[in-house]
UniProtKB/Swiss-Prot annotation:
It comes from the Bacteria. ATP binds at residues 8-18. GO terms for molecular function: ATP binding; ligase activity, forming carbon-nitrogen bonds; zinc ion binding. One of its GO terms (biological process) is queuosine biosynthetic process. Pathway: Purine metabolism; 7-cyano-7-deazaguanine biosynthesis. Catalyzes the ATP-dependent conversion of 7-carboxy-7-deazaguanine (CDG) to 7-cyano-7-deazaguanine (preQ(0)). Keywords: ATP-binding, Ligase, Metal-binding, Nucleotide-binding, Queuosine biosynthesis, Zinc. The keyword Ligase applies. This is 7-cyano-7-deazaguanine synthase. It comes from Rickettsia felis (strain ATCC VR-1525 / URRWXCal2). Signal peptide: none annotated.
Length: 224
């Protein structure tokens, strides 16, 4: 069975990717990060999520991106923006963008893949996020893959899989539902309460709620 490293945050996108990788028959080696993020609820959710899958290993990597901040997710002095309607959502890079986060995460995944002999890495980026998050662009993924194949000692090519890349958020949710993803064990909120209730009006919550609405399905998680 082929091995794959799956980046799993605890959000809806990475949960869908996890289900896709399982459907493709990979031996799953999951990797999550505690990077000092405001939303530690992600890590609690991901531990529940992976119980539903035949995960060979689950690594939680501890790094502290609060060391340089620059994002509302890693600097408590920067407020998470809240909105009233999806039409108010920003079209440029928001303060919730974490500088170089996907580069850091993919670099760790690459190192892990090299150690276990995996030639496939999965990440849940998609182009509907690319206007807000520059490290979700297809050209970024292509460039990272090229770098990875210059930088490692595996021998055969590393492939960075982005199965959601051309999907809108509602398509991602639809795909996950078809694959049996239990979205109850996910959280997308940038600013959850201490008891893991989603705020319902940050950028991530608004996009998520809109996606479930377009699928005529109620989001199974709890909101404030």
């Amino acid at each position: 069975m082929k091995k794959a490293v799956i980046l799993v945050s605890g959000g809806a996108d990475s949960a869908t990717v996890l289900a896709i990788a399982r459907e493709m028959g990979y031996e799953i080696h999951a990797m999550s990060f505690n990077y000092g993020q405001r939303n530690n609820a992600e890590l609690r959710k991901v531990k529940e999520l992976i119980k539903e899958y035949n995960v060979k290993q689950h690594k939680i990597v501890y790094i502290d991106l609060r060391a340089f901040g620059g994002s509302a997710l890693t600097d408590n002095n920067i407020d998470v923006p809240h909105y009233h309607d999806v039409n108010e959502l920003p079209e440029d890079v928001p303060v919730t963008y974490v500088p170089a986060r996907n580069t850091i995460f993919l670099s760790y995944a690459l190192g892990y893949a090299e150690v276990i002999g995996a030639k496939d890495i999965f990440i849940g980026v998609h182009t509907s996020d690319s206007a807000n998050y520059p490290d979700c662009r297809p050209e970024y993924i292509k460039s990272f893959e090229e770098m990875a194949n210059l930088a490692t000692n595996i021998g055969n090519r590393i492939t960075i899989h982005t199965p959601l890349i051309d999907m809108a958020k509602e398509q991602i949710i639809k795909t996950g539902l078809e694959l049996g993803v239990d979205y109850k064990n996910t959280i997308s909120c940038y600013d959850p309460t201490e008891d893991d209730l989603s705020c319902g009006n940050c950028l991530a919550c608004m996009i998520r709620l809109d996606a479930f609405k377009k699928n005529n399905v109620q989001d199974p998680i709890n909101y404030v």
